[in-house]
């Protein structure tokens, strides 16, 4: 949470995204700005050249009782005021904690074989993808012993985050540092330039937010109390599907 909100503070210093090595001001991928129309300040968010009125949320939002020009609103940034220096300090402090914690967790996954044993999908898992998608759409969750294991969509989602989004987030964050670019010149080359890295960093962050939101929804849908108890204590109660009642035999003797 601190990484996201402090990152939005940093983004607000220049609320636009580009692709390549340099900022192409006339061709932004994304731009949040404020424009004056009929004497009033309006927020306009432009995505691939298509403008949208986002007054009150993006581009222009209420700050200390009046509409002010800023990318994301103050309630979504740390600190609330426009303070790039403080935002960078918060971001870099928690970035180190994130990187160290992530490295230790990845080492644990390898040593404990959690990655291969629990998260890596088998051939049978991959063949079950269509049925798993259908079950999720219907909010139908596994019962019995199957409920204690990750289904194939969970496995793929965790692998995309753990082996894709999170490493890419770290690499793109490092690429935005001129000092690290000098030490590791392969970084901006691999990611298509520093502005591309900034765009990738932004997209990865919101992809992880989306993953988290879906994850929380699934916890509620699958049974909040049982799921949270298993997360906190490791105790998961397995419920078995009840057998349908047998039809009465009307011809049987009393």
Place the predicted regions along the sequence by residue.
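Membrane-embedded alpha-helical bundles that constitute the cytochrome b-like, heme-associated redox core
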Residues: 1-254
């Amino acid at each position: 949470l601190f990484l996201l909100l402090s990152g939005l503070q940093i983004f607000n210093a220049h609320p636009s995204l580009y692709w390549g090595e340099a900022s192409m001001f006339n061709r932004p991928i994304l731009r949040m700005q404020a424009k004056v129309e009929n004497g009033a300040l309006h927020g306009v968010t432009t995505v691939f050249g298509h403008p949208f009125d986002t007054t009150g949320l993006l581009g222009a939002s209420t700050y200390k009782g009046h509409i002010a020009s800023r990318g994301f609103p103050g309630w979504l940034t740390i600190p609330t005021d426009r303070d790039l220096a403080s935002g960078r300090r918060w971001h870099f402090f928690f970035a180190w904690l994130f990187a160290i914690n992530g490295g230790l967790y990845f080492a644990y996954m390898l040593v404990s074989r959690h990655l291969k044993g629990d998260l890596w999908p088998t051939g049978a898992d991959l063949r079950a993808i269509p049925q798993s998608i259908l079950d999720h759409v219907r909010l139908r969750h596994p019962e019995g012993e199957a409920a204690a294991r990750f289904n194939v969509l969970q496995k793929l989602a965790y692998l995309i985050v753990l082996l894709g989004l999170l490493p890419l987030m770290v690499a793109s964050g490092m690429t935005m540092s001129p000092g690290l670019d000098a030490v590791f010149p392969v970084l901006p080359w691999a990611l298509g330039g520093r502005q591309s890295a900034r765009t990738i960093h932004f997209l990865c962050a919101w992809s992880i937010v989306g993953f988290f939101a879906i994850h929380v929804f699934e916890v509620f849908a699958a049974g909040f109390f049982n799921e949270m108890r298993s997360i906190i204590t490791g105790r998961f109660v397995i419920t078995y599907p009840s057998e349908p009642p047998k039809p009465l035999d009307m011809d049987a003797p009393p």
